[in-house]
């Protein structure tokens, strides 16, 4: 573990005692949130030099668990200061004191606002950047802030869009459970020990109480042991003080295979407001849980069947938030991508080609695809796994399957319909059905353009099925080294599956298991602030349907 404390960084170490743990002997998520909020607040005040209050804590990801007897270290530092607010990066490491083994336990980002005395104006000093990683985080902080600021508009737009195809989403997979029995309400009286050093209710304490009622709500659905996996955002809308009554209301909103979203609302009442029944909405959060059974196996949650209008609003809201959450993953943190491309070896071309095709088929057959968008001829799905996000786009095309196959298997034609592709050329004709292409793509997020070296393996249907396959994956070819003009990027697994509907139409399914280098092209669409996937899909349909006999001569 790093022992040195960097300038501007605050470090807290805690030995986990029984009082900090839940019934399973694991560190309570609520207790951890209290410690994280305290550490982040002190980091903010160290930079600002004046009192600071929590505005929000978001993108909280729990990577592991900690148990009684282990030691945790919380590191918090300001990544960027804006005019009156700061983003604080929080990282929690757990260490076993017997083995010395360390693991990443949790990461999160908090936003704190400086609170001057009286009417004094505040303009926070910039963060002094000393390392390349600090510069990266400083730049990403600006991107994360943009996502936060546009969150409400993005959410409202997705909700508006989803209302047009709500029946399609609900009917995609019939729900079997209702959320009626998951409603939880609890009350807390704010006492002096619950207040922070400013006299307001300690934000970490409010988050801990919220986590408690959310856990109870999740347990009522799963009948197992729920554990907190992530939190979209704790958003503090207003303060509360000693003497306030805080009412916490929690209910399950929706389920996604092995996860469940629970929404929590907090209202504060002073003595007069309590008598009048007029509270103040001071906080909201959406907590995502996994759960295990008595054999410690992950539970698959039942699909939710919304019944009332409010059920449906919450059901759709959870889908929208999940979509935004997936889309903003690439701006949460910066990690160096591990090379995944296969080394091209002509003596193993058969094996590499077959592996390419099988990987695409396996991706398509995975369970857990969640629909995010439905249009007249287009459906978009996402699949969130432990370390990967994949996208699937189904298109109904008014053209024979063999025509679509010939057009899509010739990647030199892709720049004609895909706005991300600048150029695409064959650099190695391996066989009749396997080619290696060099591809250049457009600039994204103001960076340098990206280039790819990919193996394309195409297969016509076998006798026992009617599926045409076009599979892509990156390979390393010594004759095409990386260039300083481009960022050499990778395709893990992508391609098209084409099935005939009748003699004059087909279904084209595009799949892509996204690498870090490809995710920026898709993130805005998945997250709801771009329509690039829909636009590319519509362009692809138009390209195939409008293909002329002359345009097909080279591929037929």
Curated annotation (Swiss-Prot):
Domain START per the UniProt entry, residue ranges: 327-536
Residues binding CoA, per UniProt: 54-56, 83-85, 145, 235-237
Gene Ontology CC terms, in alphabetical order: cytosol; intercellular bridge; nucleoplasm
Every HotDog ACOT-type domain range: 6-118, 180-295
Known catalytic reactions: acetyl-CoA + H2O = acetate + CoA + H(+); butanoyl-CoA + H2O = butanoate + CoA + H(+); hexanoyl-CoA + H2O = hexanoate + CoA + H(+)
Name of the top EC class for this enzyme: hydrolase
Quaternary context: Homodimer or homotetramer.
Role: Catalyzes the hydrolysis of acyl-CoAs into free fatty acids and coenzyme A (CoASH), regulating their respective intracellular levels. Preferentially hydrolyzes acetyl-CoA.
Name by which UniProt lists this protein: Acetyl-coenzyme A thioesterase
Organism: Mus musculus
């Amino acid at each position: 573990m790093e022992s040195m404390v960097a300038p501007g960084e605050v470090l807290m170490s805690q030995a986990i005692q029984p009082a900090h743990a839940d019934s399973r002997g694991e560190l309570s998520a609520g207790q951890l949130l209290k410690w994280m909020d305290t550490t982040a607040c002190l980091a903010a005040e160290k930079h600002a030099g004046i009192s600071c209050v929590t505005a929000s804590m978001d993108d909280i990801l729990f990577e592991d668990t900690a148990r009684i007897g282990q030691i945790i270290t919380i590191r918090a530092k300001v990544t960027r200061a804006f005019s009156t607010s700061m983003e604080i990066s929080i990282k929690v490491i757990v260490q076993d004191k017997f083995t010395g083994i360390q693991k990443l336990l949790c990461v999160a980002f908090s936003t704190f606002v400086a609170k001057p005395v009286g009417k004094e104006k505040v303009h926070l000093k910039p963060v002094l950047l000393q390392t390349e990683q600090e510069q990266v985080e400083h730049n990403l902080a600006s991107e994360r802030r943009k996502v936060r600021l546009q969150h409400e508009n993005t959410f409202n737009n997705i909700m508006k869009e989803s209302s047009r195809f709500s029946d399609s989403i609900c009917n995609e997979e019939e729900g079997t459970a209702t959320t009626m029995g998951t409603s939880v309400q609890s009350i807390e009286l704010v006492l002096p020990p619950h207040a922070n050093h400013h006299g307001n209710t300690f934000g970490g304490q409010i988050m801990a109480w919220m986590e408690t009622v959310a856990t109870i709500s999740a347990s009522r659905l799963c009948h197992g042991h729920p554990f907190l996996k992530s939190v979209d955002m704790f958003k503090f809308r207003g303060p509360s003080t000693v003497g306030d009554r805080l009412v916490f209301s929690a209910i399950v909103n929706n389920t996604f295979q092995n996860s469940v979203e629970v929404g929590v609302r907090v209202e504060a009442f002073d003595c007069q407001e309590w008598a009048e029944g007029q509270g103040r909405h001071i906080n909201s959060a959406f907590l995502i849980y996994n759960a295990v059974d008595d054999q410690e196996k992950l539970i698959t949650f039942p699909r939710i069947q919304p019944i009332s209008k409010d059920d449906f609003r919450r059901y759709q809201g959870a889908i929208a938030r999940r979509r935004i959450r997936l889309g903003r993953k690439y701006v949460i943190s910066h990690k160096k991508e591990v090379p995944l491309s296969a080394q091209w070896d002509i003596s193993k071309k058969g094996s590499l080609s077959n592996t390419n095709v099988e990987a695409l088929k396996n991706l398509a057959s995975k369970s857990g695809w969640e629909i995010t968008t439905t249009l007249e001829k287009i459906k978009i799905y996402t699949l969130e796994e432990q370390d990967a996000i994949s996208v699937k786009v189904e298109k109904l095309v008014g053209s024979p399957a063999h025509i679509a196959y010939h057009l899509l298997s010739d990647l030199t034609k892709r720049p004609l319909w895909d706005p991300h592709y600048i150029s695409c050329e064959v650099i190695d004709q391996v066989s009749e059905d396997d080619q290696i292409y060099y591809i250049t793509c457009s600039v994204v997020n103001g960076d340098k353009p990206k280039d790819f070296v990919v193996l394309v393996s195409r297969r016509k249907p076998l006798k026992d099925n009617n599926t045409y396959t076009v599979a892509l994956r990156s390979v390393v070819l010594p004759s095409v080294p990386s260039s300083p003009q481009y960022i050499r990027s990778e395709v893990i697994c992508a391609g098209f599956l084409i099935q005939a509907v009748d003699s004059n139409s087909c279904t084209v399914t595009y799949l892509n298991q996204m690498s870090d280098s490809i995710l920026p092209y898709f993130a805005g669409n998945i997250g709801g602030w771009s329509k690039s996937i829909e636009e590319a899909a519509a362009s692809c349909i138009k390209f195939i349907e409008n293909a002329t006999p002359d345009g097909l001569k080279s591929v037929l």
